[in-house]
Amino acid sequence: MNENIKQNYLNHPKGIMSWLLTLDHKRIGLMYLFSGILFFFLGGLLALVMRFELAAPGNDIISNEVYNNVYTLHGAIMIFLFIIPAIPGALGNILLPLMVGAKDVAFPRLNLASFYIYSFGALFAMYTIINGGVDTGWTFYTPYSTQSSSNVVPMTLGIFIIGFSSILTGLNFIATIHKMRIPGLTWYKLPLSLIHI
């Protein structure tokens, strides 16, 4: 490749390592998007299991304990692994620098690190599926979570790790909006869609 051509998300080197070690905001946004789609389908599959159980009276596809586990995992996956981190992570990483006229986010390494923190927290939370599940409901309210199995702790820790990743991503977006806007783009001229990200 010609050395005068600047690398962007279209002409990166090929291979899995170029994706895993990228600092390009669009590629990181695509990684958030693909992981969000994966968790969306996993949560949707759990919703289908619940719907099949409730389709007809007396229809016992799964037991009551397994239903409570599926209910909790569906809610936790859809809220904490899809809606909260994946949508702002995907849309924000792809669109936010383009909307403010920046070439990249303010801290590209922090951007990649927050994706890996999100992935680590998601794996930690998914460990509970293999280890027997959680049956407290996705809100993890105290009476149920204190009387439940020991799987509440890894699920809660995974959610805290995912929340930390979302905080780092949000701080990166705030720094990008504040410091990397093009000249003339004042606070009152910012696109309104930046506020929802």
Describe each PLM feature range.
Residues 195-197:
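Conserved small/polar residues in nucleotide/adenosyl-binding loops
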Residues 1-17:
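Short, Lys/Arg-rich, polar N-terminal cytosolic tail immediately upstream
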Residues 51-174, 181-184:
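Membrane-interface helix-loop-helix modules in multi-pass inner-membrane proteins
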